[in-house]
């Protein structure tokens, strides 16, 4: 596998430098290179091209589990360990996150707190039974931009979202209104959120009541009570935001729109869905 790495990078660095870094000899590399290719080597080269295509199609976001699932969906039968080994050997890696934390929850307010109806039971038998709502932040050259989002727990689809340059309730309300207009939910829907003022204030509670939605709220300081929503925000930042430098709010809005509507909801393989897409799950449930 070390010789594979040397072969992949010899156009960029001298072979002797690469061999020294990997503690192998140049003569050993050239002897390896001059051998007739085995059937396995030819298969690996074809497979690597397919892996790189899947990885590129995901915008560099997929690691080996999702690459493997995507290959399986294309009727390419291969073991997950083989995919992982080829990706590691040839430097095909998923994007990684940069840790940073900004508090978007203000739970010091006089509004009533709804009970926690979920109790971390993150399962729903059909779409529009349980929604999750939360707010996160995006850095831009014009200051913070705040993304309010609503997720359907069954499909993991982002059914509503809104972006504002402030943390007032309008952003959360706009995301809820988009979700209601888009999904047209029936009775019995629960929406779970943190206990922030945006979700506990009178305007938001009135909007829930008008739509026939029951509110549910996390315990104080328990982000795991809304874990799937936290996971989506982590994914968004790992796969997109942490690899961008937005000069303006509009740049961030366009990029996030393309990610949510063009990639995440329609194309991204989701581990909690058995490596299927939110759109696929929604269509099956229709």
Language-model-derived ranges and their functions:
Residues 1-286:
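Charged DNA-binding/catalytic regions of mobile-element recombinases
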């Amino acid at each position: 596998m070390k010789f594979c790495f040397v072969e992949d990078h010899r156009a960029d660095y001298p072979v002797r430098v690469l061999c020294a870094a990997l503690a192998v000899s140049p003569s050993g590399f050239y002897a390896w290179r001059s051998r007739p290719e085995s059937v396995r080597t030819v298969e690996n080269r074809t497979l690597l091209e397919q892996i790189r295509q899947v990885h590129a199609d995901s915008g560099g976001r997929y690691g080996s589990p999702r690459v493997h699932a995507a290959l399986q969906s294309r009727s390419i039968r291969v073991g997950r360990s083989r995919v992982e080994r080829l990706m590691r050997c040839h430097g095909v890696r998923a994007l990684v996150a940069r840790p940073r934390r900004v508090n978007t929850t203000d739970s010091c307010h006089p509004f009533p707190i709804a009970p926690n109806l979920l109790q971390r039971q993150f399962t729903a038998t059909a779409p529009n039974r349980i929604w999750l709502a939360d707010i996160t932040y995006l850095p831009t050259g014009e200051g913070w931009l705040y993304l309010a989002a609503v997720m359907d727990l069954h499909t993991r689809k982002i059914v509503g979202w809104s972006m504002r340059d402030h943390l007032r309730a309008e952003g959360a309300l706009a995301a809820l209104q988009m979700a209601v207009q888009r999904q047209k939910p029936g009775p019995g829907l629960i929406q779970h959120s943190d206990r922030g003022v945006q979700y506990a204030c009178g305007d938001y509670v009135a909007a829930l009541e008008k739509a026939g939605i029951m509110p549910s709220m996390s315990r104080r300081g328990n982000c795991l009570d809304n874990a799937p929503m936290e996971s989506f925000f982590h994914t968004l930042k790992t796969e997109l935001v942490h690899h961008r430098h937005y000069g303006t709010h509009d740049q961030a809005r366009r990029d996030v729109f393309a990610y949510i509507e063009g990639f995440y909801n329609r194309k991204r393989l989701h581990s909690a869905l058995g490596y299927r897409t939110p759109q696929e799950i929604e269509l099956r449930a229709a």
